[in-house]
Regions:
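The beta1-alpha1 cofactor-binding region of Rossmann-like NAD(H)/NADP(H)-dependent oxidoreductases
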Residues: 1-11, 43
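Active-site loop of short-chain dehydrogenase/reductase
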Residues: 22-23, 37, 68-81, 114-117
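C-terminal helical subdomain
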Residues: 114-123, 141-182
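A glycine-rich helix->loop->beta "capping" turn
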Residues: 15-26, 34
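Catalytic Tyr-X3-Lys loop
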Residues: 24, 32, 39-58, 77, ...
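Catalytic loop of short-chain dehydrogenase/reductase
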Residues: 75-100, 106, 110-113
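SDR active-site strand-loop-helix element
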Residues: 29-30, 76-83, 122-124
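A short, exposed helix-loop element centered on a Lys and neighboring polar residues
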Residues: 61-62, 106
Length: 182
């Protein structure tokens, strides 16, 4: 569903719980960004991005964590990127929302980790190899696959995080192609 529509988000959470039972795993992979300078952008972009990148995570966690606490187990994995740790040029409408998202996830991890809920933040430090990504930035259209994070590899890492033993839970996990400059 459109996670920026909070009423619809709540409705979908209730429907999933009613039809399938309480989820044990939540993957928050919603993202919206505008990449312009402060003066070229619009202040309302920050609010729109915040609603998708951060507020939707809060509503999902609020709807699903009570059942995880009751079951004494659960996994919440939030996907993000380097904007969560540093603002760069052309990200004043995006970076603050990703930083807030990471801090929210960290707060949830500290609150609910002792209750059996593993919360992790997966930072993908690369463009992801999708048709949308390749057409969004013209210089990426003809680039070799090796410069991109591959969706299957990201999914494999998410699965790995979700399967971690309680004695070795991670929170900040960074992944990137080997040629990514960092």
């Amino acid at each position: 569903c459109d996670v920026s529509n909070i009423d619809k988000l709540k409705e979908v959470c209730a429907k999933v719980k009613n039809e399938m039972g309480a989820p044990e795993v939540l993957i928050h992979n919603a993202v919206k960004g505008n990449f312009e300078t402060l003066l070229d952008g619009k202040p309302e972009w920050l609010e729109e991005n915040f609603r998708i990148n951060t507020t939707s995570l809060m509503y999902l966690a609020h709807a699903l964590i009570p059942d995880m606490v009751k079951a004494k187990k659960g996994v919440i994995i939030v996907t993000g990127n380097t904007a969560a740790k540093r603002g760069i040029a052309n990200t004043p409408y995006f970076a603050p929302t990703k930083a807030a998202q990471r801090i929210l996830a960290q707060s949830l991890a500290r609150d609910f980790g002792p209750q059996g809920i593993h919360v992790a933040y997966l930072m993908v430090d690369a463009s992801i190899n999708t048709p949308w990504t390749r057409t969004r930035i013209e210089k990426q259209i003809n680039q070799p696959d090796i410069i991109f994070a591959q969706p299957k590899d990201i999914a494999d890492e998410i699965y790995h995080i979700a399967q971690q033993a309680r004695s070795a839970w991670s929170f900040d996990v960074e992944i990137r192609p080997d040629i990514e400059q960092w």
